[in-house]
UniProtKB/Swiss-Prot annotation:
CDD domains named among the record's database cross-references: hydroxyacylglutathione_hydrolase_MBL-fold (cd07723)
This protein's UniProt keywords: Hydrolase, Metal-binding, Zinc
Pathway the protein acts in: Secondary metabolite metabolism; methylglyoxal degradation; (R)-lactate from methylglyoxal: step 2/2
Designated name of the protein: Hydroxyacylglutathione hydrolase
EC number(s) stated in the UniProt entry for this protein: 3.1.2.6
Family annotation (SUPFAM superfamilies): Metallo-hydrolase/oxidoreductase
Family: Belongs to the metallo-beta-lactamase superfamily. Glyoxalase II family.
């Protein structure tokens, strides 16, 4: 069974420490800075076995060099070759599975272009490490890809088993809820989730992970096929909506300017 722990960093990032419950070998996902990771590993008597990277942005890769310096360049660092990330030792090109030696679990590699063109998500048992593609009640900005690519990537993640947990890289949930309530103010699932998140954050508890089943019920970016979201988008932009891609494209534009 996996044990997954969040290391908070910067204003709203989470670096995820992943290990088997009975093992002291651990991996870290998207370390944007080295020292909090080193501090956690030492404080919990763990051995850092490697680094897993979803995409190239600095708040996800900025800690690679510091970790290699501390561990004398002995760390394997896995990440997408297409992202051109300095410090990657094991480039992922066309592979769809990855074996992390000390994790005793197969890692499914899921290409999710949109936020960046080479962005990957990783499915480990029932945990989805999706970087900046899917957030709780939201999705990432489209910096390099197209709306069609991002929608396809989100659809791919949405098709995974509903019991999977979403380990995204940022604590954006409350701000995403504020937007979602503007889009679908009468969604009872969203209202209930908003109440839970507000209490958790007031107690300084992470809102993550979220369950995919929850996201399918509350996340407007995963519900662009629904009448409720289509109608809201059509009203906001005073236009006729013809398909799901148009809904998603305009919804993302709405959020960008929210």
């Amino acid at each position: 069974m996996l044990t997954i722990t969040a290391i908070p960093a910067f204003n709203d990032n989470y670096f995820w420490i992943v290990r088997q419950a009975d093992s002291n070998f651990a991996y870290v996902v998207d370390p944007g800075v080295a020292q909090p990771v080193i501090d956690y590993i030492l404080a919990h008597d763990l051995i850092l076995a490697g680094v897993l990277i979803t995409h190239k942005h600095a708040d996800h890769v900025g800690g690679i060099q510091g970790l290699q310096d501390f561990y004398q360049n002995s760390l394997p660092v896995y990440g997408p070759k297409a992202e051109g990330i300095a410090g990657i030792t094991h480039e992922i090109i066309d592979e769809r599975t990855l074996c992390l030696p000390h994790l005793e679990a197969n890692v499914e590699i899921i290409p999710v272009p949109g936020h960046t063109l080479g962005h990957h998500a990783y499915l480990i048992e029932d945990a989805i490490f999706c970087g900046d593609t899917l957030f709780s009640v939201g999705c990432g900005r489209i910096f390099e890809g197209s709306a069609a690519q991002m929608l396809a990537s989100l659809t791919k993640l949405a098709s995974l088993p509903a019991h999977c947990k979403i380990y995204c890289a940022h604590e954006y949930t409350q701000s995403n809820i504020n937007f979602a309530l503007t889009v679908t103010p009468n969604n009872p699932n969203l209202l209930q989730y908003a109440s839970w998140v507000a209490k958790a954050r007031a107690d300084n508890i992470p809102s993550l992970p979220s369950f995919l089943s929850t996201e399918l019920a509350v996340n407007p970016f995963l519900r662009c096929h629904t009448y409720e979201v289509k109608t809201a988008v059509a009203s906001q932009f005073n236009t006729e909506i013809n398909d799901e891609l148009q809904t998603f494209t305009l919804l993302r534009k709405w959020k960008d300017n929210f």
